[in-house]
Amino acid sequence: MSTIQSETDCYDIIEVLGKGTFGEVAKGWRRSTGEMVAIKILKNDAYRNRIIKNELKLLHCMRGLDPEEAHVIRFLEFFHDALKFYLVFELLEQNLFEFQKENNFAPLPARHIRTVTLQVLTALARLKELAIIHADLKPENIMLVDQTRCPFRVKVIDFGSASIFSEVRYVKEPYIQSRFYRAPEILLGLPFCEKVDVWSLGCVMAELHLGWPLYPGNNEYDQVRYICETQGLPKPHLLHAACKAHHFFKRNPHPDAANPWQLKSSADYLAETKVRPLERRKYMLKSLDQIETVNGGSVASRLTFPDREALAEHADLKSMVELIKRMLTWESHERISPSAALRHPFVSMQQLRSAHETTHYYQLSLRSYRLSLQVEGKPPTPVVAAEDGTPYYCLAEEKEAAGMGSVAGSSPFFREEKAPGMQRAIDQLDDLSLQEAGHGLWGETCTNAVSDMMVPLKAAITGHHVPDSGPEPILAFYSSRLAGRHKARKPPAGSKSDSNFSNLIRLSQVSPEDDRPCRGSSWEEGEHLGASAEPLAILQRDEDGPNIDNMTMEAERPDPELFDPSSCPGEWLSEPDCTLESVRGPRAQGLPPRRSHQHGPPRGATSFLQHVTGHH
């Protein structure tokens, strides 16, 4: 067991939790407090010098946040020696991907997805107040704090790829964001803002429900193709402005086509790039609305006499899909902001409370909601939006909800649901219509689609039933998600964020709708009037570091220079008022810290699932 020492503390390394291209994460025992911590260890060389500056700069900007209320990881301290950098964080339990893996990727109930979504949206809203884009939101970077004591309480981690609005004027290709969660503006080369994180969260929500990534593209063409086949083509003005549009689209040869652009076919892409497109989706959705039909989600709507509990759960799932649709839009300015999303009926439970307050499902949802927000030693208090004082969520009126005591011990917080067998579609063309998202991808003319309008009429003439909600999505992928539970998810080639800045893309400024104070009476009015908090002024700095995710341990750099803390922008590490106590934040809530033991660190400490596992 090795030992490392900072100026103020000493750490015993218990075990290495994981290794990545950037370095490794170890579990350590902090002698001064007796608590277990996570230590991020990177080589001290010129390449990582700049990278570490970026992460430290972002952590410094976040030092005023309460990690418990903002749902971000607590940073303790930074130090270095002649060979390595060390960043010390609180130790958390496991990330959402590992939690899914432990539960055999069973679909997560909508009530638990809401609990996670609420907290991540709160984190994004707080980051936006500091003008910070996380830029790498995914299940691996959302950590469960303590699933036993605080079910589905989560924190956002890994700010190595984060950026500050005022400093990141350009983005380099390849890429920010992990591919499965990459926003359209990054894929197409359009101006972007903090709403790239909202897109990523929408993909995470869908993945928690599906048990499989919504858009698991093997490359950027597949990623764009999947989005087009589910959500339709982007509007022409977006493709006209996109500097990467020609990679995935071509001009439509049909003069009477509704869209002057069409998606390149798989054969076109193969001929141009020698890369064969792959099909990696589990569910081939023809619209985002079909998300609610997966994993038995539409059962309640099909029952002749559904009970109240089934109706409540179905209504909640439908509301969740409506929010996902607002988060997954081609155009970023049409995408819901974090603050407005916190007012959405799915997150606030407004609709569920008004129509299903007496159901057991509502009581379970409310209890899960509360426990995730409970900070030890504090009552759950509503978080207030900075711009207008409107609560993001309001629990005061439900404090006397009936039956909460009995609910506490009657049901587990995670109900492991095995996905029912999907009813395969016999004919993919049964429900084609002009409104179908996937229509027109390959440049069909308007006349080619007119006959599709006759499908309901033909069905009525022949006596066939036309389902109101559309068919279930086609089940496309049959094998296990991991092809063996002992295997870790490996990142496909080119899926990681890259820091070799080239092919610059201009960064858009703060979203126009976020510039005005919110005075709306409803969550929708609040969004249109600017529900997002205006970013605080951030000191301009001269350097912006590249992403931390793509550091290569084997990369050799000529004349490596050692890191000098005083060289950080703003010289905050050397300021007398920026001590360990000023950046460590409040003490971790939960189990009381253990004091130093005479015979070394205690055993049986909570395990920490590395937040640096590979990207999709």
UniProtKB/Swiss-Prot annotation:
Write out the biased-composition intervals (Polar residues).
496-511
Q: How is it modified after translation?
A: Autophosphorylated.
Q: Describe the reaction catalysed, as an equation.
A: L-seryl-[protein] + ATP = O-phospho-L-seryl-[protein] + ADP + H(+); L-threonyl-[protein] + ATP = O-phospho-L-threonyl-[protein] + ADP + H(+)
Query: Could you tell me the keywords of this UniProt record?
Result: ATP-binding, Cytoplasm, Kinase, Nucleotide-binding, Phosphoprotein, Serine/threonine-protein kinase, Transferase
EC number annotated for this UniProt entry = 2.7.11.1
Q: Where is the active site?
A: D136 (proton acceptor)
Q: What InterPro entries does UniProt report for this protein, alphabetically?
A: Kinase-like_dom_sf, Prot_kinase_dom, Protein_kinase_ATP_BS, Ser/Thr_kinase_AS, Ser_Thr_dual-spec_kinase
Could you give one GO CC term from the UniProt record?
cytoplasm
Top-level taxon = Eukaryota
Q: Which residues carry this modification: Phosphoserine?
A: S511
Protein name stated in the entry: Homeodomain-interacting protein kinase 4
Organism this protein belongs to: Homo sapiens (Human)
Q: Which gene encodes it?
A: HIPK4
